[in-house]
Design a protein with these regions (language model features):
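Generic, well-ordered alpha-helical scaffold segments in large soluble proteins
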Residues: 26, 30, 110-118, 132, ...
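Active-site His/acidic residue clusters
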Residues: 48-57, 122-160, 198
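Phosphate/oxyanion-binding active-site loops and adjacent basic polyanion-contact surfaces
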Residues: 15-20, 96-112, 122, 149, ...
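Short glycine/proline-rich turn/loop motifs
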Residues: 3-7, 93-96, 139-146
Length: 229
């Protein structure tokens, strides 16, 4: 397994650890593998896992090349339209867009490019485009769900609303109103930053998982003689 579009380990990814099948896999089976299933996200797992084992492609972002990449699990080289997208995206190497509103826009722009260039929804069998917005997850982990002093959280969600509207308009134009099924879901929510809660005299706290793991390992070592590294 190797990266396509990058030489970094960010490309060494596949769904091999996914134990079950996905709705995308079942769609491919039901149409004798004529349907196209494509996953798009900034994070590798957010693109790969929803698309499933038999996906035609999964694309994610690698900051070391400032562009969208994939792996040899799916293809040997990036399609020309992906290369063009990367050239025109204007991202800087080393910058991670996940924690900002530009990550939302980048994801939806990539999804729209896939929609048009892969001619999704234009064939005789239904296609599936899995889009995961990684920025809402990253900003909630970084600042919590409370409005941060710099309003990064607010900006991300306002951008999500605007960009989703634009993408729905692209679906209407490309596939046609009433000709596609759209569903929204999430793997988890966010929570308020415990330090912010304390500032406002609200109950809350954090959990030092590193300390808990060290304590657990010490107890296992004492009880069973296990030296866990």
């Amino acid at each position: 397994m190797k990266g396509v579009g990058t030489d970094s380990k960010a490309g060494n990814m596949s769904p091999k650890n996914l134990l079950g099948t996905t709705i995308g896999d079942m769609l491919r089976c039901a149409t004798d593998f004529r349907s196209k299933v494509i996953g798009i996200a900034l994070k590798d797992r957010a693109s790969i896992l929803p698309a499933g084992h038999s996906a035609n492609a999964a694309y994610w972002y690698d900051k070391s090349v400032a562009g969208v990449i994939t792996s040899s699990y799916y293809m040997e080289k990036l399609p020309d339209w992906v290369k063009k997208f990367n050239r025109e995206a204007g991202m800087k190497k080393g910058y991670d867009p996940k924690s900002g509103a530009d990550g939302v826009t980048l994801t939806f722009n990539m999804a729209e490019a896939a929609l048009k260039n892969e001619q999704l929804g234009k064939g005789e069998t239904p296609d599936m485009l899995c889009i995961s917005i990684s920025s809402t997850d990253a900003i909630s982990h970084k600042t919590g769900t409370w409005l941060s002093p710099g309003k990064e959280n607010e900006e991300v969600f306002l951008t999500l609303d605007r960009d989703m509207k634009k993408f729905l308009e692209a679906l209407d134009a490309q596939v046609g109103k009433g000709n596609y099924l759209l569903f929204l879901t999430a793997d988890h929510g966010g929570s308020h930053n415990p330090n912010t809660l304390k500032e406002h005299k609200l109950p809350g706290g954090g959990c030092d998982m590193g300390a808990k793991m060290r304590d657990l390992n010490e107890k296992l070592k004492a009880e069973f003689g296990l030296d866990i590294k």
